[in-house]
């Protein structure tokens, strides 16, 4: 093992945060220094050249002050027996850089701690503070890290002696292996193996437990029910399926695949052909995938990997739909207990304790969203909507006074995708078809996830919780998706016959499901499974939940073609079996020459005993809200601080919201980029205005008083969130229903039945809505010992509804941004039928009450009519602004609209009744719309025609200025500055950012919100975007070739190719593997573009691993150098491509002064819609644009310009190499956050070389070449956004 020191790992503010944590824990630590340490497992000693090359590889990241370590060492590494994603990707880079003798690289974090006063027990506590025990371990000597590379002989299979010891042997195995088998399932297995006349293996039992867990089989939703002594006619699942039976329109696939599919639009899908790699549009029906998953248990145990693999698993579900599909846009949601932010605790937050094995709500919301965002970011999927709720209280609910809250959290991951019409249904698996696992190797992680997720937290052994934690490697999943893309893009020639993702239960669930669904059996070879940990037993190899894997069937004659695709995409795969005619499953172990699995499929997946559920109905008593002492001003302040209501910027800007170039509506609204969007909208393609929309509905606290109302409101809210998008027929809207409950808790089972019936049998059929997809999680309870007291925390019955719809015209979507300069009217549409119920509202929660009567869907007919009217108003363009009423009631609806419009409001709520608190804070369904005064009569008439006249209330107007005024007639109820309200609303997000990120950055952003004079994004163009300067050259018919270059992990190449294609280029897909193998060269190209993403997951510095793979490969290095020295060539590097090319400066003439691009000052991935100024420079791509100020998509974690010193910066400026700078909304060059999202000096965010032929930019012009893909834009812009000029300049330069 070679040990190599790396660079310092922690910035000053990170060190300071650690010291503060130590102080808070009463640990006397004087100083901490941390640096990376690299460990190389080598097959042969490294010679001088190889060692030098390796040392260069391992020099990466920002330049921080390093010094000789002092103090005691605590070395944090991945747990021995696991392999980190960092290791996988760093090892790939080493191999591509000519270091084949590197068997494996691994990285540790060495803390050198000066703390002479600490006792040994305190050192142990400090070590616990510094690492995540679920993923890491701590050594005290560098040499101990050799344990990371220890090799063990394969463990053998274990037999369970059922024939000798009887049923008791199964009961013992059930406990020892954490199988979570019910008694009737043990009976079933005992009978089955007695009949087979042999003993089961541990792997067979484990496989059975995973395949038949509640998590996988949904036994409760398929059970027979008896409620209050009365047998029920339908199971829960049958009631859900009733929605499809009543409204099957537009649904193409439901209940039978990894995701459901609904009818989409006929558009031009843009992708390269299989032969020449030439990008073009392919006009075809493009249908819409829908999927929403939960990943609750893993997120409670270890939030980052739990949430990351939750998003990753849902993405795989989409990609593995039909015969292969394309994930497109995602959503993420969280329900947790109270945050109790240190120093910012709220009056309603009490600490009720929690089990040691799960983390706090604050830790979940610090790390979980980062994990979910990181996976989506690195995979290349924009995360465009979500929700966040906190609840934790002692309440008098259905079962009397008890603790209700989300110690077991909800982690929701969902999204939309697209699929070809011919691939919606899976194919047929022929006998002899090759059964393949695509993706990463098996590792001893995530064991028992399906069974563990099916238990209440506290029931399983802590070691089993430990074992069920998973690891994420999104860059690997991206490679696998590229393989799937290459396959579906072949159309009828798609080599994939059948595909499933690998999720809960690992291969033990995925492979039986694959062959069984295909009507076949399977014969498998254990030792053909790629395996990074040879010491694993057959059970561990077959059942582990290593992520980023798919299983599929490929015909033998197509295997060579499939192999070539995988090699090009650097995606590992293995043929591990073949399909058989006999419906039998066998797994042979060549190492031990035995057969760990030898089972008829019907034993594994046959008719296991059907669950019978008996339940008793309970009804919460409910007590009217005690309003003594509740003052309106204080109530507003409290409600604006409740996380479900408060600003969620800290959850949003960590996630890429522009990748694909097809995002038409993200969370951020208007020139002030306020996170208040009601729904997410994407374009169906890069050449149309058809699209897809998704929104969420969720009112879980209401279930503490009324189960059915809570479910109905979730459906209603999803609809009101979607209503201001141009959809048309309500039957176009399809729902996902995700049900979370504490099964078996008194009252909850009957409540679940009531809720499902209310939605599946009543409301959805009445509205014409279908629920073709969903998920259930039935173990939402935690138990622990609190001193001498046993405690339980039970989540409310929680239904999260996600609404999906095809969009007729994405340009018509209306946002909450008020237009104060118009002669306008604000109207409330109240669907509460005059009810102002305050039970289980935000107001009740912040005063630690529950209340009695709750909101509800008062009239399904009125809700349907409301949707119809909104669709007419949207289609006609009569709405100026729209926002639904939800958490926080009318007060929050109006406030958020004012925030988005940066304006004042004068609202008269007198007509809503004498009870101002009830009028402002009830959460009945409804919306506020802003219209032109001139259209008022026509719009009112429309409401009358639909029978909604009584729902319509005139409120007042939006006005320029800063005053937020509420009146009852002439009587003033409340007057406050909108800026003050905005500050209150943002404080929760600010405090979370301060804890998690660089507090200096968080403080700067919070200060910027308090500038009432902020003009918002202010655009000034020095050219006309409608002027197509490339048109004369396109007219000549010649399309010069542009090499659209990507490396493994790059994810922004398609929109880049589309932008160049529109400018008149022939865009060619070029993978780095094409250059390494010599299949492709750069000789025939005039233009080279390196695209954005996460090459190699950015593990050796953003873009640095990619660059070094060029620099250390002599032939490829020469090819790049020749290209850059060739006259008349152009090159563009964007984001990751910018980082990569900046590290090729030694090959590029006139690039000697280029800076490095390193970690953002905030030390967080930043996704922003930023204002930049085009500066005077040599850049040929920015000619004619100088002086323009225009918005652009920013998405990076390492974009800060780093120079050697002040003289270096001055030289860059003097040489005229600066091409773009960040400016604030006043047009001034800035280093302030977030206008400058990465802290680059002098606002520098793009540079060029001395000739102007090579331009590097961190922001993404290719993602906003269409106006429709801007988060906000001036109303007068046409189809082409102003950044299209950059690509047309390129075409003009080539003549």
UniProtKB/Swiss-Prot annotation:
Function: Phosphoribosylformylglycinamidine synthase involved in the purines biosynthetic pathway. Catalyzes the ATP-dependent conversion of formylglycinamide ribonucleotide (FGAR) and glutamine to yield formylglycinamidine ribonucleotide (FGAM) and glutamate.
PROSITE patterns: GATASE_TYPE_1 (PS51273)
Protein's name according to its UniProt entry: Phosphoribosylformylglycinamidine synthase
Gene Ontology molecular function: any one: metal ion binding
Annotated InterPro entries: Class_I_gatase-like, FGAR-AT_N, FGAR-AT_PurM_N-like, PurL_large, PurL_linker, PurM-like_C_dom, PurM-like_C_sf, PurM-like_N_sf
UniProt keyword Protein biosynthesis, yes or no: no
One Pfam family matching this protein: AIRS_C
GO CC terms: cytoplasm
Record EC number: 6.3.5.3
Organism of provenance: Sodalis glossinidius (strain morsitans)
Keyword Membrane (UniProt): no
Domain of life: Bacteria
Coarse class of the protein's main subcellular location: cytoplasm
Catalytic residues as annotated in Swiss-Prot or TrEMBL: 1135, 1260, 1262
Residues at which ATP binds: 306-317, 385-387, 677
Domain Glutamine amidotransferase type-1: 1042-1295
């Amino acid at each position: 093992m070679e040990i190599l020191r790396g660079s310092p790992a922690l910035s000053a503010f990170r060190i300071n945060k650690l010291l503060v944590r130590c102080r808070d824990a009463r640990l006397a630590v004087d100083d901490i220094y941390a640096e990376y340490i690299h460990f190389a497992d080598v097959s042969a000693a490294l010679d001088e050249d190889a060692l030098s090359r390796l040392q260069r590889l391992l020099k990466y990241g920002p330049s921080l002050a390093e010094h000789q370590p002092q103090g005691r060492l605590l070395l944090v590494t991945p747990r021995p027996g696991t392999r980190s994603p960092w290791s996988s990707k760093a090892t790939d880079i080493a191999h591509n850089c000519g270091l084949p003798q590197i068997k494996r690289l691994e990285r540790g974090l060495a803390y050198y701690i000066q703390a002479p006063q600490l006792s040994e027990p305190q050192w142990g506590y400090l070590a616990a503070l510094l690492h995540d025990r679920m993923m890491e371990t701590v050594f005290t000597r560098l040499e101990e890290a050799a344990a990371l590379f220890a090799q063990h002989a394969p463990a053998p299979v274990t037999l369970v002696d059922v024939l000798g010891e009887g049923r008791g042997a199964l009961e013992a195995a059930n406990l020892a292996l954490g199988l979570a088998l019910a008694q009737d399932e043990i009976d079933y297995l005992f009978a089955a193996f007695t009949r087979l006349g042999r003993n089961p293996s541990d792997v067979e039992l484990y496989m059975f437990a995973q395949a038949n867990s509640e998590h996988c089989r949904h036994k409760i939703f398929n059970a027979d029910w008896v409620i209050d002594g009365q047998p029920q006619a339908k199971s829960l699942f049958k009631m859900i399926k009733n929605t499809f039976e009543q409204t099957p329109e537009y649904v193409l696939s439901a209940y039978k695949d990894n995701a459901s599919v609904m009818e989409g639009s006929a558009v031009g899908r843009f992708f390269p052909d299989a032969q020449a790699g030439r990008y073009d549009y392919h006009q075809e029906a493009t249908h819409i995938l829908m999927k929403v998953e939960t990943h609750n248990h893993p997120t409670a145990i270890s939030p980052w990997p739990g949430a990351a693999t939750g998003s990753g698993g849902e993405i795989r579900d989409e990609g593995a739909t039909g015969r292969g599909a394309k994930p497109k846009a995602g959503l993420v949601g969280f329900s947790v207990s109270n945050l109790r932010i240190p120093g910012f605790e709220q009056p309603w937050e009490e600490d009720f304790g929690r089990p040691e094995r799960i983390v706090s709500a604050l830790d979940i919301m610090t790390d979980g969203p980062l994990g979910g965002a990181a996976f989506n970011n690195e995979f290349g999927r924009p995360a465009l909507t979500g929700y966040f709720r906190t609840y934790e209280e002692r309440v008098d609910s259905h079962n009397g006074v008890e603790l209700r809250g989300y110690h077991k959290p909800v982690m929701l991951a969902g999204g939309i995708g697209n699929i070809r019409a011919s691939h919606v249904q899976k194919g047929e698996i022929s006998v002899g078809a090759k059964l393949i696992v695509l993706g990463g190797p098996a590792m001893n992680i995530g064991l028992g996830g399906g069974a563990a997720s099916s238990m209440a937290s506290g029931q399983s052994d802590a070691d089993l919780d430990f074992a069920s934690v998973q690891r994420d490697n999104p860059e690997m999943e991206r490679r696998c998706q590229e393989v799937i893309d290459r396959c579906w893009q072949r159309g009828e020639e798609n080599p994939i016959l059948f595909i499933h993702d690998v999720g809960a239960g690992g291969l033990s669930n995925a492979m039986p499901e694959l062959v069984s669904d295909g009507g076949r059996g399977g014969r498998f070879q254990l030792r053909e499974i790629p395996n990074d940990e040879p010491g694993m037993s057959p059970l561990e190899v077959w059942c582990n939940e290593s992520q980023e894997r798919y299983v599929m069937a490929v015909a033998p004659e197509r295997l060579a073609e499939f192999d070539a695709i995988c090699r090009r995409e650097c995606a590992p795969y293995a043929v591990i079996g073949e399909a058989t005619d006999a419906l039998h499953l066998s797994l042979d172990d060549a190492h031990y020459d035995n057969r760990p699995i030898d089972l008829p499929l019907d034993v594994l997946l046959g008719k296991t005993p059907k669950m019978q559920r008996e339940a008793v109905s309970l009804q919460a008593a409910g007590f009217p809200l005690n309003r003594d002492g509740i003052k309106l001003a204080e109530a507003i302040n409290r409600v604006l601080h409740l996380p479900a209501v408060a600003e969620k910027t800290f959850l949003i800007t960590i996630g890429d919201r522009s990748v694909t170039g097809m995002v038409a509506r993200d969370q951020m609204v208007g020139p002030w980029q306020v996170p208040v969007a009601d729904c997410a909208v994407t374009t169906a393609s890069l050449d149309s205005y058809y699209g897809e929309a998704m929104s969420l509905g969720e009112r879980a606290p209401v279930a503490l008083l009324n189960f059915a109302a809570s479910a109905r409101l979730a459906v209603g809210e999803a609809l009101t969130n979607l209503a201001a998008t141009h959809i048309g027929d309500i039957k176009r809207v399809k729902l996902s229903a995700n049900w979370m409950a504490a099964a078996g808790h008194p009252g909850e089972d009957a409540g679940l039945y009531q809720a499902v019936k209310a939605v599946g049998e009543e409301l959805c059929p009445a509205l014409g809505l279908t629920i073709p997809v969903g998920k259930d999680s039935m173990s939402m309870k935690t138990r622990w010992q609190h001193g001498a007291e046993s405690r339980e925390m039970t989540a409310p019955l929680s239904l999260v509804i996600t609404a999906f719809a095809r969009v007729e015209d994405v340009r018509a979507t209306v946002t909450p941004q008020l237009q104060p300069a118009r002669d306008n009217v604000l109207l409330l549409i109240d669907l509460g039928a005059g009810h102002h119920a305050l039970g289980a509202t935000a107001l009740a929660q912040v005063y630690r009450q529950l209340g009695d009567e709750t909101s509800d869907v008062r009239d399904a007919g009125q809700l349907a009519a409301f949707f119809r009217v909104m669709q007419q108003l949207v289609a006609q363009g009569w709405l100026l602004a729209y926002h639904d009423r939800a958490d926080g009631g009318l007060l929050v609806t109006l406030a958020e609209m004012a925030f988005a419009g940066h304006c004042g409001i004068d609202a008269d709520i007198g007509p809503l009744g004498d009870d101002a608190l009830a009028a402002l804070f009830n959460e009945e369904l409804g919306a506020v719309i802003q219209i032109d005064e001139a259209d008022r009569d026509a719009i009112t008439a429309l409401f009358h025609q639909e029978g909604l006249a009584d729902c319509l209330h005139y409120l007042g107007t939006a006005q320029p200025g800063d005053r937020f005024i509420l009146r009852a007639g002439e009587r003033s109820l409340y007057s406050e500055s909108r800026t003050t309200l905005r500050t209150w609303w943002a404080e929760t997000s600010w405090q979370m950012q301060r804890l998690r990120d660089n507090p200096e950055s968080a403080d700067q952003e919070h200060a910027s919100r308090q500038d009432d004079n902020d003009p918002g994004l202010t655009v000034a163009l020095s050219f006309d975007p409608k002027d197509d300067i490339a048109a004369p050259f396109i007219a000549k018919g010649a399309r010069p070739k542009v090499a659209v270059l990507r490396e493994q992990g790059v994810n922004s190449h398609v929109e880049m190719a589309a932008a160049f294609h529109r400018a008149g280029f022939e865009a060619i897909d070029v993978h780095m593997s094409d250059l390494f193998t010599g299949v492709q060269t750069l000789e025939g190209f005039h233009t080279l573009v390196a695209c954005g993403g996460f090459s190699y997951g950015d593990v050796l510095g953003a873009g640095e691993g990619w660059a070094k793979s060029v620099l250390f490969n002599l032939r490829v290095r020469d090819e790049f150098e020749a290209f850059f020295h060739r006259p008349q060539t152009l090159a563009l590097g964007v984001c990751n491509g910018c980082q990569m090319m900046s590290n090729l400066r030694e090959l590029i003439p006139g690039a000697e002064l280029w800076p490095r691009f390193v970690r953002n000052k905030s030390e967080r991935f930043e996704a922003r819609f930023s204002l930049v100024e085009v500066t005077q420079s040599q850049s040929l791509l920015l000619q004619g644009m100088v002086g323009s100020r225009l918005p652009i998509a920013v998405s990076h974690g390492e974009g800060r310009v780093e120079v050697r010193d002040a003289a270096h910066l001055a030289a860059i400026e003097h040489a005229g190499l600066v091409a773009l700078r960040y400016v604030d909304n006043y047009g001034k060059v800035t280093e302030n956050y977030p206008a400058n999202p990465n802290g680059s000096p002098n606002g520098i965010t793009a540079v060029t070389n001395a000739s102007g032929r090579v331009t590097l930019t961190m922001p993404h012009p290719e993602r906003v070449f269409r106006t429709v893909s801007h988060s906000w834009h001036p109303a007068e812009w046409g189809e082409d956004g102003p950044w299209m000029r950059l690509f047309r300049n390129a075409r003009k330069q080539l003549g």
